[in-house]
Curated annotation (Swiss-Prot):
Residues 256-285 are annotated as: Disordered. Belongs to the cyclin family. Cyclin C subfamily. It is found in: Nucleus. Residues 53-144 form the Cyclin N-terminal domain. Component of the srb8-11 complex, a regulatory module of the Mediator complex. Pfam families: Cyclin_N. One of its GO terms (biological process) is positive regulation of transcription by RNA polymerase II. GO terms for cellular component: mediator complex; nucleus. This is RNA polymerase II holoenzyme cyclin-like subunit. Keywords: Activator, Cyclin, Nucleus, Repressor, Transcription, Transcription regulation. GO terms for molecular function: cyclin-dependent protein serine/threonine kinase regulator activity. It comes from Neurospora crassa (strain ATCC 24698 / 74-OR23-1A / CBS 708.71 / DSM 1257 / FGSC 987). Component of the srb8-11 complex. The srb8-11 complex is a regulatory module of the Mediator complex which is itself involved in regulation of basal and activated RNA polymerase II-dependent transcription. The srb8-11 complex may be involved in the transcriptional repression of a subset of genes regulated by Mediator. It may inhibit the association of the Mediator complex with RNA polymerase II to form the holoenzyme complex. The srb8-11 complex phosphorylates the C-terminal domain (CTD) of the largest subunit of RNA polymerase II.
Length: 345
């Protein structure tokens, strides 16, 4: 993996705005209006959930590393910004993406083993006479559509590297890791840098762990925590902009602070004690003290708070959407166009 994200093809070629993504997808559908009309599909988030679940099933069966599963999902997202999904067999694409990701993440799998395992899940899509050739052909197709940009930087590295610096407990890291896993079912890998996603996951982990139940994101009990995190960041950003405007008007500057980093995230912190000794309830609530330390760390950095707000809101929206996911319906709609168009042959 390339050491420098800032010079990577991921940053230069595979980060988009939401409007750009929407325009690319609309263009693909406009090129195939009859196909789109004939085979309606679930919303994209539900398709991403389905792909995630299928890749995780196959990866678990084969004992693959999480990094390879994550990279495969990024490949699928990139590929489907270039190719209309109804022109492909998604099962071929996801198996091939995983096969290619294993190569890139230094845990290669033999193509015949991958084909045999895939046949166990999708016997009609992977017939013994053609399955290996099919994966080989699809591999070149993926590489071509991605312009050979195969190195993917993930948020996991940022999370593990900051564990000591931020004083994160292993439970914090585990929950943040789960949030990062979940973000691959959204468009966030195509919208924001991995370090922003990692820091958002840390924030959500710290906020959610204040719930003594320790529930993971996506449950009803955790929804309020996610909303609180989003509101805190939004309020902090507004405070930062107001403070920056006042400093600009008075000709004052504060070294190391930008409109994004000057927020201090005070909205999510407990009240300060009059003596300036830190959080008034710090000794009683160590979880809030940890949130305070993380906020102070962010205030001293140049992290884009607006991007963290967007990441948080996207995750909230995703968790709400996940509750309406219907696996049977999604699977049937995919199989319908695959069989009707003979893409399972």
């Amino acid at each position: 993996m390339a050491a420098n994200y800032w010079e990577s093809t991921q940053r230069k070629h595979w980060l988009f705005t939401k409007d750009e993504l929407a325009a690319m997808r609309a263009k693909l559908e406009a090129e195939e209006p009859n196909l789109v009309a004939s085979f309606p599909l679930p919303q994209l988030r539900h398709l991403n959930i389905y792909f995630n679940q299928q890749i995780n099933r196959l990866g678990k069966r084969m004992g693959l590393r999480q990094q390879a599963l994550a990279t495969a999902q990024v490949y699928i997202k990139r590929f489907y910004t270039k190719v209309e999904i109804r022109r492909t067999n998604p099962h071929h694409v996801l198996v091939t993406a995983l096969y290619l990701a294993c190569k890139m993440e230094e845990c290669p799998q033999h193509i015949r083993l991958m084909a045999n395992e895939a046949r166990g899940f999708w016997p009609t899509d992977f017939q013994s006479q053609t399955e290996v050739a099919r994966i080989g052909e699809c591999e070149f197709y993926l590489i071509s559509e991605m312009s050979s940009h195969l190195i993917v930087h993930s948020p996991y590295r940022t999370l593990t590297s900051l564990q000591g610096e931020l004083g994160l407990a292993q439970e914090d890291v585990n929950l943040a890791w789960s949030v990062i896993n979940d973000h691959y079912m959204t468009d966030l890998p195509l919208l924001h840098p991995p370090h922003v996603i990692a820091l958002t996951a840390i924030l959500l982990a710290l906020v959610l762990r204040q719930d003594p139940s320790g529930r993971l994101p996506g449950t009803a009990a955790s929804a309020s925590g996610l909303v609180a995190a989003s509101a805190a960041l939004a309020q902090a950003q507004a405070q930062a902009q107001a403070r920056a405007a006042m400093m600009a008007g008075g000709g004052q500057t504060v070294p190391g602070l930008t409109p994004q980093s000057s927020s201090g995230l005070q909205a999510m912190l407990p009240p300060q004690s009059p003596a300036g000794e830190g959080p008034a309830e710090g000794n009683k609530n160590p979880r809030m003290a940890k949130v305070h330390r993380f906020a102070a760390w962010l205030s001293d950095s140049n992290i884009d708070i607006e991007a963290m707000v967007d990441c948080t809101q996207e995750l909230i929206s995703f968790y709400e959407c996940h509750e309406q996911y219907n696996d049977k319906n999604t699977r049937e709609q995919i199989n319908r166009f695959v069989k009707a168009r003979g893409l399972d042959k």
